[in-house]
């Protein structure tokens, strides 16, 4: 009689533990899947942001194609390693867009700067020039374009950070994904703590990059005022980077929570089984 009661009690305890363990596994697995989806979306957004040229956009009135000044500006913009003032003047005048790697302007399609008197948008084409590595790491001057005005260290390091930090962020996320894949293969959530930490660092890098870019643009416009009737705004590439940062933070929180709580619950369940 007593043996039957003990056996029934043991059976109930085992069944209860199995049910609780299954519920916990489902909860942690759900958090892990959601974190993976957020991580994937933020990676796509970050990669698209890095690879596109719409971090900042200028809107300017139509320029006269026959102007010798406009022709000269285009030729200087198209030159290798044009100075900062030269290419920014072109961006201001020709509806320019700027990315991390390239700068683009909208110019007449005819290379000889001749168009019919009735100009339409069909005669416009976008021309882009890539920033060379020398330009990416070149010093910025207190007076843009004037090499004798002294080096502006703040703008110099803001530019370098806005260029480097997105790549660091993307690299951290890829490394975190590799660790997460290993965790899946090992059927253990605990290694995902490292994945969560890497995503947290990636989010900080993305946030730092966005902050550096905003500060750099504001300082540039203090040095080079926009011409009359020209306006500027942050583009969709910049917005993708802004959205990517909170996604990285949310993924990080879910990864760390799932790994930490799963280990804690597993320890409690192990102690319960022993008891």
Placement of each model-derived feature along the sequence:
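Extracellular structured ligand-interaction cores
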Residues: 35, 97, 101, 162, ...
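Long, compositionally biased interface segments
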Residues: 224, 232-266, 272-275
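A surface-exposed beta-alpha-beta supersecondary segment
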Residues: 56-160
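Cytosolic juxtamembrane regulatory segments of membrane proteins
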Residues: 8-17, 59-75, 195-200, 228-232, ...
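Juxtamembrane/interfacial segments around transmembrane helices
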Residues: 82-96, 220-224, 247-257
């Amino acid at each position: 009689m007593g043996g039957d009661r003990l056996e029934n009690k043991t059976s109930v305890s085992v069944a209860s533990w199995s049910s609780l363990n299954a519920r916990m596994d489902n909860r942690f697995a759900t958090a892990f899947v959601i974190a993976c989806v957020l991580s994937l979306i933020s990676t796509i957004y970050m990669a698209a942001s890095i690879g596109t040229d719409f971090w900042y956009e200028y809107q300017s009135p139509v320029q006269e194609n026959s102007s010798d000044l406009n022709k000269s500006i285009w030729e200087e913009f198209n030159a290798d390693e044009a100075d900062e003032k030269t290419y920014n003047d072109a961006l201001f005048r020709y509806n320019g867009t700027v990315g991390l790697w390239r700068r683009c302007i909208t110019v007449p399609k005819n290379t000889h700067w001749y168009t019919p008197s009735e100009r339409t948008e069909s005669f416009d084409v976008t021309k882009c020039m890539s920033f060379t590595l020398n330009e990416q790491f070149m010093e910025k001057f207190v007076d843009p374009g004037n090499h004798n005005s002294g080096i502006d260290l703040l703008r110099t390091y803001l530019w370098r950070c806005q260029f480097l930090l997105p790549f660091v962020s993307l690299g951290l996320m890829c490394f975190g994904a590799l660790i997460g894949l290993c965790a899946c293969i090992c059927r253990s959530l605990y290694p995902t703590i490292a994945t969560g930490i890497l995503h947290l660092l990636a989010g900080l890098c993305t946030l730092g990059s966005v902050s550096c870019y905003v500060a750099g643009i504001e300082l540039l416009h203090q040095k080079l005022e926009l011409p009359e009737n020209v306006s500027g705004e942050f583009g969709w590439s910049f917005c993708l980077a802004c959205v990517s940062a909170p996604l990285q933070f949310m993924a990080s929180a879910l990864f760390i929570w799932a790994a930490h709580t799963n280990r804690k619950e597993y320890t409690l369940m192990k102690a319960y089984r022993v008891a």
